[in-house]
Protein backbone atom coordinates (compact mmCIF):
# COMPACT_ATOMS: atom_id res chain seq x y z
CA UNK A 1 0.00 0.00 0.00
CA UNK A 2 2.84 2.38 0.88
CA UNK A 3 4.63 1.59 -2.39
CA UNK A 4 1.42 2.25 -4.28
CA UNK A 5 1.08 5.72 -2.71
CA UNK A 6 4.71 6.54 -3.59
CA UNK A 7 4.11 5.54 -7.22
CA UNK A 8 0.95 7.69 -7.35
CA UNK A 9 2.83 10.67 -5.94
CA UNK A 10 5.65 10.22 -8.46
CA UNK A 11 3.16 10.03 -11.31
CA UNK A 12 1.40 13.15 -10.04
CA UNK A 13 4.74 14.96 -9.77
CA UNK A 14 5.62 14.04 -13.34
CA UNK A 15 2.23 15.24 -14.59
CA UNK A 16 2.49 18.53 -12.68
CA UNK A 17 6.05 19.08 -13.94
CA UNK A 18 5.04 18.35 -17.54
CA UNK A 19 2.11 20.78 -17.25
CA UNK A 20 4.37 23.51 -15.85
CA UNK A 21 6.87 23.04 -18.70
CA UNK A 22 4.00 23.19 -21.20
CA UNK A 23 2.65 26.43 -19.69
CA UNK A 24 6.13 27.99 -19.60
CA UNK A 25 6.71 27.04 -23.24
CA UNK A 26 3.45 28.72 -24.29
CA UNK A 27 4.14 31.84 -22.24
CA UNK A 28 7.73 32.05 -23.51
CA UNK A 29 6.65 31.65 -27.13
CA UNK A 30 3.90 34.24 -26.76
CA UNK A 31 6.24 36.82 -25.26
CA UNK A 32 8.84 36.59 -28.02
CA UNK A 33 9.73 39.61 -30.14
CA UNK A 34 7.22 40.02 -32.92
CA UNK A 35 6.76 42.78 -35.41
CA UNK A 36 3.48 43.75 -36.97
CA UNK A 37 3.85 44.58 -40.64
CA UNK A 38 1.43 45.52 -43.35
CA UNK A 39 1.81 44.78 -47.04
CA UNK A 40 -0.52 47.08 -48.95
CA UNK A 41 -2.50 47.54 -45.72
CA UNK A 42 -2.85 43.78 -45.18
CA UNK A 43 -1.73 42.96 -41.62
CA UNK A 44 0.74 40.15 -41.03
CA UNK A 45 3.01 38.83 -38.28
CA UNK A 46 6.74 38.24 -38.57
CA UNK A 47 7.91 34.78 -37.56
CA UNK A 48 11.32 33.06 -37.51
CA UNK A 49 13.57 36.11 -37.53
CA UNK A 50 16.97 35.63 -39.12
CA UNK A 51 19.96 37.88 -39.68
CA UNK A 52 22.71 37.88 -42.32
CA UNK A 53 25.63 40.28 -42.71
CA UNK A 54 26.36 41.45 -46.26
CA UNK A 55 28.90 44.15 -47.12
CA UNK A 56 29.02 45.28 -43.48
CA UNK A 57 25.28 45.95 -43.56
CA UNK A 58 22.74 44.10 -41.47
CA UNK A 59 19.86 42.62 -43.40
CA UNK A 60 16.98 41.12 -41.46
CA UNK A 61 15.44 38.25 -43.40
CA UNK A 62 12.03 37.52 -41.99
CA UNK A 63 9.11 35.27 -42.81
CA UNK A 64 5.63 36.71 -42.51
CA UNK A 65 2.36 34.85 -42.73
CA UNK A 66 -0.33 36.95 -44.40
CA UNK A 67 -3.88 35.66 -44.46
CA UNK A 68 -5.77 37.48 -47.18
CA UNK A 69 -7.12 35.37 -50.05
CA UNK A 70 -4.92 32.57 -48.75
CA UNK A 71 -1.49 32.89 -47.19
CA UNK A 72 1.84 34.31 -48.30
CA UNK A 73 5.30 33.15 -47.36
CA UNK A 74 6.86 36.59 -47.25
CA UNK A 75 10.50 37.59 -46.84
CA UNK A 76 11.98 41.04 -46.74
CA UNK A 77 15.10 43.01 -45.97
CA UNK A 78 15.76 45.60 -43.32
CA UNK A 79 12.93 45.20 -40.85
CA UNK A 80 13.67 46.16 -37.26
CA UNK A 81 11.83 43.62 -35.04
CA UNK A 82 11.01 46.37 -32.53
CA UNK A 83 8.97 48.55 -34.85
CA UNK A 84 5.71 48.51 -36.75
CA UNK A 85 6.26 48.99 -40.47
CA UNK A 86 3.74 49.88 -43.13
CA UNK A 87 5.10 48.27 -46.26
CA UNK A 88 3.66 49.77 -49.43
CA UNK A 89 4.61 47.74 -52.45
CA UNK A 90 5.69 49.98 -55.32
CA UNK A 91 5.47 47.24 -57.86
CA UNK A 92 5.10 43.51 -58.21
CA UNK A 93 6.92 41.72 -60.97
CA UNK A 94 6.83 38.17 -62.25
CA UNK A 95 9.01 37.24 -65.21
CA UNK A 96 9.57 40.96 -65.69
CA UNK A 97 5.87 41.83 -65.84
CA UNK A 98 3.83 43.64 -63.20
CA UNK A 99 0.76 41.86 -61.91
CA UNK A 100 -1.70 41.63 -59.05
CA UNK A 101 -0.60 39.10 -56.39
CA UNK A 102 -4.22 38.18 -55.64
CA UNK A 103 -4.43 36.54 -59.08
CA UNK A 104 -1.54 34.15 -58.51
CA UNK A 105 -1.56 30.39 -58.54
CA UNK A 106 0.19 28.18 -56.00
CA UNK A 107 3.99 28.26 -56.05
CA UNK A 108 4.25 31.54 -57.96
CA UNK A 109 7.00 33.85 -56.73
CA UNK A 110 6.79 37.63 -56.91
CA UNK A 111 9.54 40.15 -56.39
CA UNK A 112 9.11 43.85 -55.91
CA UNK A 113 10.27 47.08 -54.32
CA UNK A 114 8.68 48.65 -51.28
CA UNK A 115 8.93 51.79 -49.20
CA UNK A 116 10.60 51.49 -45.80
CA UNK A 117 10.97 53.95 -42.92
CA UNK A 118 13.51 56.78 -43.25
CA UNK A 119 12.84 57.14 -46.99
CA UNK A 120 14.50 53.83 -47.84
CA UNK A 121 13.44 51.17 -50.28
CA UNK A 122 13.35 47.46 -49.63
CA UNK A 123 13.27 44.41 -51.84
CA UNK A 124 10.91 41.57 -51.08
CA UNK A 125 9.68 38.34 -52.54
CA UNK A 126 6.45 36.50 -51.91
CA UNK A 127 5.66 32.89 -52.68
CA UNK A 128 1.95 32.17 -52.99
CA UNK A 129 0.97 28.77 -51.63
Model-derived features: where do they sit?
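Bacterial N-terminal signal peptides that target proteins for export
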Residues: 4-18
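Bacterial N-terminal signal peptides
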Residues: 17-27
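N-terminal Sec signal peptide cleavage junction
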Residues: 29-33
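Short, solvent-exposed loop/turn segments enriched in Ser/Thr/Gly
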Residues: 45-50, 103
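Asparagine-centered strand-capping/turn motif at beta-strand->loop junctions
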Residues: 51-58
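Short, hydrophobic/aromatic beta-strand segments
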Residues: 60-67
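Intrinsically disordered, low-complexity Pro/Gly/Ser/Thr-rich segments with frequent PxxP/GP/PP motifs
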Residues: 70-102
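Terminal connector regions
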Residues: 92-129
